[in-house]
């Protein structure tokens, strides 16, 4: 067999006995560890998980209805995950890739197996933060569509291309491709997680929420619940996000899937400024799936906040060695910079640039993280140019915040504040967003708003950045106390929320998320 570097082959004499009926993804009934407190995410979702109903992969992803089922093992596990858009172990994905490559070599007209191969390459690239897998994924997915176009029913390959576009941060293309599938087959549930990611990347949280509703109407289980939790988090509905992700972890059917939910719960705890809880969740994720290196970065972040600097440095270094995402390289560089280790910081920044250049060669747009890096580390004018272009492509909250900050660093605080306010309108609560607004407001002589936003940043997460959190405290001290004689009751009377609204942090997970689904989108 040719090496990975020699794939795809130049000559297509290309099918491995295709597994016919994949194993069920979701359990027939509730998970054994389920408690009475953790009811489903509202009545609509509960109805989807009726006892005795087994959700299986799309039949075409198995290679055809007449093919024998795969033997239990890594290929079957990866096939199930790939078909459901769920995370899979790297070793399982590698086995599936080898399996499908051997099959399509002798069965070049098996469009379903080409689609599986392309989606497996994508999953492998995401798992390793290695964008060199993306051209291979695209080649296999387009080969599938050449054999059987999307208009003739090859939705799996088109959904795979849309997911690949999301991975490359090309959210507009992802939305276009996924919407075509949805229009042809609105009951195909596998398209909705891709649409959710695309709409979120484009800053259209209402569109993402609509897609969540449609997904929950069609499908229950871990994948749907995790997708809803991610959207709730982006909208700032933290209790609802925690409820959905807790439920998703309970319904996960593989260690990798469960660990991914636990990692997201750790990230959510970090957003709230709860490093001990974040550490517990990320540690649980790593025990469940030791290969989940994103949780290792989250663990390092929490350790640093808890004063465990040596452990944080060790875990950050291990995380970026195994999962060299540009954002992790930036975080580690800023950690070194906060410790006065300038040479080590510069080494990580050089790795960041090299990784972004490699990603660019494989079709990945890293403009957001590059713009954030340039704004704070010596090239704000370049950051403004880069982020203006990115804003035209993907006008989401993170880009608005990064562009506003870059404008301030480039000497344009008035225009910068306009974008920072857009970020606040588009996104949920973010300590970094609040800090950026507070700094610009102080620069513009708006002491009251500056004080409120800097206080909000530290109240939301007092550990949000090893470089910037100390500056937020210094900025507050410089502003001093508000002048006496101001209004005592700034906000007026605010009634208590109605009983049973599901908005309290200690309420049941089901009622919290049910309340979120009733909100006006």
Regions found by a protein language model. Name each.
Residues 102-106, 139-146, 182-183, 213-217, ...:
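Conserved structural position within tetratricopeptide repeats
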Residues 216-220, 320-327, 337-354, 425, ...:
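TPR/TPR-like (Sel1-like) alpha-helical repeat modules
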Residues 152-158, 184-192, 219-227, 254-262, ...:
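Generic helix N-cap/helix-start motif at coil->alpha-helix transitions
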Residues 119, 123-126, 163, 197, ...:
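Residue-level recognition of tetratricopeptide repeat
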Residues 2-156, 462, 469-470, 474-521:
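N-terminal leader/linker segments that initiate helical-solenoid repeat arrays
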